[in-house]
Amino acid sequence: MIKRGDVYWVDLNKAFPEGLHYQRNIRPCVIISNEKNNKFCDTLTVVPLTTKRDHLSIHKRIFINNTENFVLPEQIMTVDRKYVLSKLYHLNFILCTFSRKNKS
C-alpha cells in the first residue's frame, strides 16, 4: 500500500500534457496525500524531487540512497495512480518548514 512519506518513481510525461509548466520525465516524487486518500482514491498528491541544485531556500535537501535530492514544494501536484510506478524509498518524516519573524 502506498503511504505518506513514500518516494515513488512517477511518469510525469504521461500525467500531464506536453507544454504545461510542470516537471517532466520519470522522476522521484514524495507522496504527501493522507492515508485515507492513498487507500481509496484514484489520485495521489505528490511533490517532485530533483537532483539539480538551484539554491532556492524553499528547496529542501534530502538524501535518498546516498543521492542528494531537492524537494520542489512549488510543484505540488495531484496525479492519477496509474502513473505511479515503483517504490524507491520511504521518508520517516514529512518535510515541513515554518518560519517566524520576531516582531520587535
Language-model features: where?
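Conserved functional hotspots at enzyme active or ligand-binding sites that engage polyanionic ligands
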Residues: 1-104
